[in-house]
Amino acid sequence: MKKLISAMLAMAMCFSLAACGAKEEPAPAPAPEASQPAEPAAPDDIAWPEGTVNVTLPYSAGGDTDTYCRALFQRVGDKLGQTFVVTNLTGGSGIVAAMDVMGKKNDGYNILFTHIGAALVQEATQTVDFSYTEDFTNCCTVAIDQTYALVAVAKDGGYKQYSHGWETLEDMLAEAKANPGKVRYSTVFGSTTQYVGMMLEKDAGVTFDNIDVGTSSGDRMAALLGGQVDIVAINYMNVKDYIENGDLICMGIMAKERVNGIDFPTFVEQGYPNVVTAKKYEVKFPKGTDMAIVDKLSATCKEIVESPEFAEVLSKYFAEPLYRDAATMNVEDPAEVEELKAGLAG
């Protein structure tokens, strides 16, 4: 036992002497942590776009949607140093273009530019079997138009042979009440015009003969001036000259409040609170597009939307700049669909 204790003491002394004589070594570096996934690329860091980007819009050349789209993406291209090619793909009140973009690659090189006036009505009425609010990746909103006007042929204008002699909204509604289904309303099924027409029928207690003569403003104006329909709901800019010339009468504007530059009462003022609509113009990608790309384009669009030059383009149509990011759209657009459903069911 004594031998064992002596041996242990000897070993302890050896270790102690060795420690005293050795140089002090730096503390070992901590073990590396487990590798973490890379952070998503910041919008400014992502190498996009590196080539031509395709932008599809669902309406004809020369209209408000086309004008805003081309004005926007010309400026986007200038800022990002690439070409954004705009293609007009009409049909189905925007459905054809929407489905076309849905079926394309979500690589950041395919974009849908549309206004959601018609789109959300289609979703609320289940006209489409897809969702504008869920089956795309939202990018941003760039403008709003609240200038839908209800017009008819004036009794003393150049098209007076097609006039009913109306001078006011109440004149037209009186005839519609006296002759249910006789006043011919130019609708576009599955669109904003269908919705506001239904709201006016409900608020005023009338029934129109709803006739779909085509989706473009040109088609519907030709039908009005040719006597095929009696009343048309249309963007004010498309009828401004006719009204000022005395060829058409404006019976009201479908906005919540008076629109700057348009000296006509709203339907709300005239006692029809549900005859309200607004067209918000949005940029969307195919679902699953990299959010770094989405955010980069959104930030670029925000700069343009806030510029005086873009506001001037919109003002020619009495529209206004409106920027909303994807997060805002993801909340507000589905809520608007539910409001439309409630209005149609109420």
Give names to the regions the model predicted.
Residues M1-T52, G346:
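Short, low-complexity disordered leader/linker segments with a strong preference
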Residues V76, G103-G108, A124-D219, F267, ...:
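Hinge/capping helix and adjacent helix->loop/strand transition within the periplasmic-binding protein
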Residues V239-S307, V331, A335-E338:
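C-terminal lobe and pocket-closing loops
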Residues I95-N106, A174-K177, M198-D203, G218-V232, ...:
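Short helices/loops that flank or line small-molecule/ion binding pockets
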